Amino acid sequence: MSATPNPLPPSEARPRPRADERRAQILREAAGCFGTRGFAGTTTRDIAGRVGITEAALYRYFPGKEAIYAAILDERIGSPDLLEPIEPLAAAGRDREVFTELALALIRSVEADPSLLRLLLYAGLEGHEMAHPFHERRVRRLRDFLTRYIARRSHEGAFRGVDPSLGARAFIGMVVDHLIVRQVFGQRDEYPQPPDQVAATFVSIFLDGIAARAEDRRDG
């Protein structure tokens, strides 16, 4: 009869995650909870269970769910700027590339982190204090950039005279609606098109509608 293998000594057991790794894991799992249930519907017990630790262990990293929620939104605020690679294209007036890259950046950021859109919606609906800085730094900045671009290109004669702010909202609205339908309502099978196809279609519809017509140029 063979002997029962001895358990691994402590030095050979699976190492515990480092503090920074555990903190990142908590934020990642908490984002999933908040994105599904909102702030009010999520408890520290829910988060600890997702991470696989006790509530007492969770409190070693964060004093409560308010701190976790704020850390998640603060992390999203500090994420890479979507506009940085688009600004040179805008300076050169490369309309199709500007709108295509903007649409792709929005789609890919949400597809890579599905909790992002849900968190933003819940933060606004629940009136969380972090919702305002998130909106100002990420959402409003994007809309203002596009508003200024449409206004400039209209002045240059490339676009017809539309309200720039409404034009910006119309374009962003197409993309965001697509993301909400897929990520919030779960209709991925109904809209399985890859990001490149989605962006190209929306950009064509938008630019065909906003492009200056010959009579607009003559009047200008």
Task: Give each language-model segment a name.
Residues 25, 33-67, 71-72:
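Helix-turn-helix
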Residues 112, 119, 129-156, 165-166, ...:
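Amphipathic alpha-helical packing segments from all-alpha helical-bundle domains
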Residues 22-30, 47, 72-76, 80, ...:
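Generic hydrophobic, amphipathic alpha-helix propensity
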